[in-house]
A protein has these predicted regions:
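Charged, solvent-exposed interaction patches on well-folded alpha/beta domains
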Residues: 1-208
Length: 208
């Protein structure tokens, strides 16, 4: 069976020794082929005139986590294996970020990611929120959006519920959130708002 992530790309190199002969490049995308950046990369690599150009082009791709490249001796064949970075959220519709907070350009080709918006200085707070909220077994709390504002602080939105953490993320708030989620699991009732900003407890709103 043909690997759907394996691309065979016939290239024409313009060096004098290979003029008029096809140069075959096989690229295996370990993480799949789903980004516009990958398509642009394929178009660009067709224009490469040497092995150095190929390697420089790969090194310039911020979405590539790691790669290996092998040239077949005495033949016009190159084998490239590429592992993509795996984004988990998009910041202000400008950049992808993976779990290690590596940044790479957002190309609007992948939509099923957490959209994060706001003037955020410490992106570790975003990872902390994702880990806390999605640690629950309730599928209703799969995050769609995380918003930060100077007025409201951190708001996390799932399909049906808004979770409000306020301006400062504390261990007490996270503990209150976990205790509340455990309670909601027991009663099988999901509120429209979970507000953990209060010192004395958690406010639940079941309104539409």
């Amino acid at each position: 069976m043909l690997n759907k992530n394996l691309l065979l790309i016939p290239l024409i190199f313009f060096a004098s020794l290979s003029l008029g002969k096809n140069y075959e490049i096989s690229i295996n995308f370990e993480s799949g082929f789903e980004y516009q950046s990958q398509k642009q990369f394929i178009e660009s690599i067709k224009l490469s005139k040497s092995s150095k150009e190929i390697e420089h082009l790969i090194d310039d791709q911020d979405w590539i986590k790691n790669y290996s490249i092998r040239y077949k001796p005495f033949k016009k064949e190159v084998f490239i294996n590429i592992k993509n970075r795996e984004p988990i959220f998009v910041l202000n519709e400008m950049y992808f970020y993976d779990r290690d907070l590596n940044k790479f350009n957002f190309d609007h080709s992948k939509k099923d990611l957490i959209m994060v918006e706001g003037p955020i200085d410490d992106l570790r707070q975003v990872i902390k929120l994702i880990n806390v909220v999605e640690s629950t077994t309730l599928s209703q709390f799969k995050i769609n959006n995380i918003n930060y504002s100077y007025v409201n602080g951190w708001d996390v939105k799932s399909n049906n519920t808004l979770i409000r953490f306020g301006k400062k993320l504390t261990k007490k708030k996270f503990n209150n959130y976990h205790e509340t989620v455990n309670y909601l699991f027991e009663i099988s009732k999901i509120p429209s708002i979970i507000d953990v900003r209060y010192k004395d407890g958690v406010a639940l709103n079941y309104g539409k």
